[in-house]
Amino acid sequence: MRNLIGKNKMHRGLMPIGDGEQLGINFQTNGSYYSSLSTSYSTNWFGNKRPNSFSVSLFYSKQSDISSYYRNNALYNSLNYGYGYGYGMLNNSYYNYESLLDDDKNIRMFGASIGWGKRLRWPDDYFQFMASVGYTRYMLRDWSYFYIANGNCNNLNLGLTLSRTSTDNQLFPRRGSEFMVSLAVTPPWSLFDGKDYAHLALDPNSATYEGELQDMYRWIEYHKWKFKSRTYTALTNSQKCFVLMTRVEMGLLGSFNKDKKSPFETFYVGGDGMSGYSYGYAEETIGMRGYDNGSISTSSAYTESTGRRTSNNAYGYDRFTLELRYPFMLGNTTIYGLTFVEGGNAWADIKKFNPFNLKKSAGVGVRIFLPMVGLMGIDWAYGFDKVYTSGGWTKGGGQFHFILGQEF
């Protein structure tokens, strides 16, 4: 973006023109079911003199649901004739999935954020501090996948992140570590709005039930804590060597009022961990290889008694990984294989958080980095423990997982 505004001008006010600035516009759609548009700007030299980062972003997305008529007929067919959801004549279905989307049932999201970061000199030069302010508006219309199906919900939050990175290579680290601790917090609206949340929205059959839900979640409140770490240890001194990677992750989503737990920003645990649209769109996706997507967090919501149920996802999770890697090709194109053991779990009630109660898995995989494509990979993992799925309680068993993009 150097000299984008005027000829031979290196800076325009406080904002530098050039020096690694990034301007991005992204649009995604799969037709009438889902679409999103986002734009962002970032620079690492805000203020001209010091390496301070600055970023601003905007996004909008819309996701539609299928009609109740189609859902009921597909269920009837699957029970009586073995038919299921399908596209056209696939799976012997008489219904075209895309043509029976109900645009009157949807969730729309609009959001904006602004962030500032600074490299620290203490305890050492590898530390960085980030602060951000974000706002998201959830606009729901007959959206049956959330605790609240209709209305507008607002999320205004402050994010604080302290991180340290000392790895020797971004694509295939041999030595060093990555640590990150973060807090996202909203104003404690329930402490000063004067509402009695203990007696709101208790009777789903009440004529005022949806209005009471809107009052309860017009402004979302929570405090969200996360810790992530990775370490890399080369087992020999050669360039192509075995590298041992260890990972520890934990996350907790707390509330200021036990009767106003947030139905958003929960943890969706299990599977490949790839982000993207889903029925529980306003959630954080956490991978756990060897299990179906979301099956670990769903199991916790199904088995734990948490009083007022506000989400089918988890409010706490942990994840531990031991991974052995070996590079087949290094450079602009990087290819390496890996084998791993992994353990983790999720809890709907954070009072029951137990880092030693783990769902375990093991497997092998490969990663390929291509300059024009980015990082891709495939893993095969076997889950040793039972989780709750649509078929009841079953072992994770053998699972293939596809990976796109770099994960922290």
Regions from the PLM with identified roles:
Residues 120-127, 236-242, 330-332, 374:
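Secondary-structure transition into beta-strands, especially the periplasmic turns and strand N-termini
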Residues 340-344, 367-373, 379-383, 407:
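Short, loop-centered acidic/histidine patches that primarily coordinate divalent metals
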Residues 1-2, 58, 248, 336-347, ...:
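Active/binding-pocket-proximal capping segment
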Residues 349, 353-373:
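Strand-loop-strand
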Residues 1-172, 177-179, 297-301, 375, ...:
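Gram-negative/organellar outer-membrane beta-barrel architecture
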